[in-house]
């Protein structure tokens, strides 16, 4: 069931959005060649411990698409890892494409977001191109994420941008509602038919829009495999691959007119 939010509840959700957005912004600015994925995980752990009312949404989380409880505070997906990467003893190298995915509850309200970037001074142009694709898909979907439009309009907009770039679309994962829980209704696919959906976007509905789980770099025949825990990789590894990006403004709060950005990262609302 879709969890609609009152104006008061929307205000109560903002601290979680600011907290998650601030952590991801700081990590994007400080992560560099030589940074170990376990250092990133410990950084987030300390941030949560130091924040009153904050709890990790990941620790002990056991989704049906995984092989056991998650034991870390952030997902770190590098290069060909699609999403849900588990932090391990790996130091980042020049040119690594990194996706950091973070969900935290603050005073009972969840914020869930991710950011992707290339480490070092020698980025692969294709990595930069796929990041640009996801940024544009996010911005385009935000424009149609408003009351009266259907979820199919959002999904179709995402798919259209991916097709313009020539990327196949992975529909295995997608966006989702957030509120008191991390994974709520509705599911928002990365592609769909315009004007088609089981329900319309409504005022007070909050969800991670667009490239919420953007698996843009799947190649034909690379249906994917599941590594230990929740990590999703491609069955055949192309060059570098990036498949999830929520950049800067992934959470949306539907009001009566325009959506409201719910995770503050680059924009310091």
Whereabouts are the PLM-identified features?
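Active-site neighborhoods and metal-handling regions in enzymes and metal-associated proteins
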Residues: 1-269
